[in-house]
Amino acid sequence: MPLPSRGPAAHPDPRNRPHRRLHARTLTVLDQVVRPAAYSRRALTRQLKHLGLLADDGPDRHRAEEALLIVGELVGNACRHSSGPTLMTSQWHPRTRRLTLAVSDPSPGVPRRKAPDERGEGGGYGVLLIDILAGHWNTVRHGDGGKAVVVTLDFPPPPADPPTPPQQSR
């Protein structure tokens, strides 16, 4: 019986594998991080690249970039409006091509849409942005008084393989 190879074929590039075969769930603890929104975007970027969803010319890149915008907004708001540990969870569901993002914090406050700050100081666009980009989002209360904001993003079906041209007989 031959031993497994240690060459490149033994560890194929995960971006070349079909999405339906990959599973990923990531939990990121953000309470000890200097720039939690940026850190969460980097963590999600690594996961999306591993899944092949952020390929330079891939069909999923645009939706994956929207996920990065959303997670940065969720984490930024959680850190701005609460004190205590903030957690980000992301999970890819390959069969349904759905990405679930959840950001938990100890604050009981629920995100709500407010008028954007027109003075140029920023703020007020987070919930509007999530409403526009997310397929679905809601708030789940925890028993300890905190909450998680959960966002679901549907990715488009993968492109169909081009039809095989008929072979000509000779």
Predicted regions and their residues:
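Short beta-to-alpha transition helix within the HATPase_c
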Residues: 25-46
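Conserved terminal C-lobe alpha helix of the protein kinase catalytic domain
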Residues: 38-41, 45, 68, 72, ...
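Conserved beta-strand-loop-beta-strand hairpin that lines the nucleotide-binding pocket
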Residues: 1-32, 79-170
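Conserved short strand/loop->alpha-helix "switch" segment adjacent to the catalytic nucleotide/phosphoryl-transfer site
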Residues: 48-72
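Solvent-exposed, charged/polar functional surfaces in cytosolic regulatory/catalytic domains
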Residues: 43-50, 136
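Short, structured helix-loop boundary elements
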Residues: 37, 41, 60-64, 127
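Metal-dependent amide/peptide-bond hydrolase catalytic core
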Residues: 75
